[in-house]
Amino acid sequence: FKVKNSIVDIAMFNGESKAFEIKTELDTPHRLNGQICDYTRLFQKCYIVIPEEKLYNYINYIGPNVGIILLKYVKRHIELYEYREAVSNANIDPEMVMSCLRTEEYKNIVNTFYGAIPDVNDFQMYDICKQQISNIPASNLQKLFLKEIEKRKNCSKLLNVVPNVVRQICLSMNLNKKTIDILIKKLNEPLI
């Protein structure tokens, strides 16, 4: 899930929005401030997931609102435990919301909150919706954003059978299973 200049390792939308940034033994904390700054503008809760032995390398790079999940290696398997719970973030940046939503999603938010979609041409629609979304109270906007994101279908298993070169097209067009099956069939047919 892309958020401004950062890509969230794991984004969860299940009643609330959570971002998880995973750091391994090989990572350094030098980009973490920027990533967390981006994530807190959109997600209600943000966590970093780090190896237990790296805790003191990272703890000074994050604020007290960011949760910490530690990876502990025990007898050839990994255990996760919550060192610090994330504090819920009541703010949400409307500009960040707009950058993450598809056209139909931001139109749905405007329609749900205001009762109508602006009667403007396609060239003006984004800017007008952005302006209207920026006037929605943060608590309402968080709920509406979450509702729209949760509507997205999780088709990762289905996309595993799609060739890499076509996967992005399927994602951006929000194709359903039937359409993807037809596309795969057509791609496998001889040209002549």
What are these regions, as identified by a protein language model?
Residues 128-192:
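C-terminal, charge/polar-rich interaction regions
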Residues 26-72:
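Catalytic cores of nucleic-acid endonucleases
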Residues 1-12:
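N-terminal, Lys/Arg-enriched amphipathic/low-complexity engagement segments
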Residues 77-152:
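A conserved mid-domain beta-alpha-beta active-site/ligand-binding segment of alpha/beta enzyme cores
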